[in-house]
Amino acid sequence: MNPRDIVEQVTALAEPVAEQLGLQLVAVAYQTHTKPATLRVDIRHPTEGTGLDDCEKMSRALEALLDTRDDLIIGAYNLEVSSPGVERVLTTDREFMAFRGFPVMVKTFGPVDGKKQWEGRLLERDGENVYLTIAGRRVALPRPQVARVQLVQSLP
């Protein structure tokens, strides 16, 4: 099975496990450039900081489920369950949905309304724009202009 299929199937298995534990699945990656391969699962607690206990519970529950699916990943692999870093760069639709309301810094390729860096709370991302709330105002930044969206600890 190719890595993309593994990620899709593990995502389908891991999402309900995370929900049962009161967590959100943020991302799944299967890295084959390491020996053994690494299956990385990122989770977050929706209302408070994600702790080591959350990662441990998710790891044990997912590992037990994966052990019943010996057809999914052939050969040895390491399972790593962690929470996204505080200053994580957001790239996937899943990440943009999981981190709605969080403080972010957006860098653009060129000036948008005279600025190349924006800080605010993430509202959403659609096919055309990334939306932030800045000082109570909704701001739309065109996706083709957005170079990077990164979580930050707090807003200035």
Curated annotation (Swiss-Prot):
Which SUPFAM superfamilies does the entry mention?
YhbC-like, C-terminal domain, YhbC-like, N-terminal domain
Query: In the UniProt record, does the keyword Cytoplasm occur?
Result: yes
Cell compartments where the protein resides: Cytoplasm
Task: Name the cystine pairs.
Answer: none
- Spell out the GO cellular component terms annotated for this protein, sorted alphabetically and separated by semicolons: cytosol
* Matches recorded under InterPro entries: Ribosome_maturation_RimP, RimP_C, RimP_C_sf, RimP_N, RimP_N_sf
Protein role: Required for maturation of 30S ribosomal subunits.
Which NCBIfam families does this chain map to? PRK00092.3-3
Name under which the protein is recorded: Ribosome maturation factor RimP
* Originating organism: Gloeobacter violaceus (strain ATCC 29082 / PCC 7421)
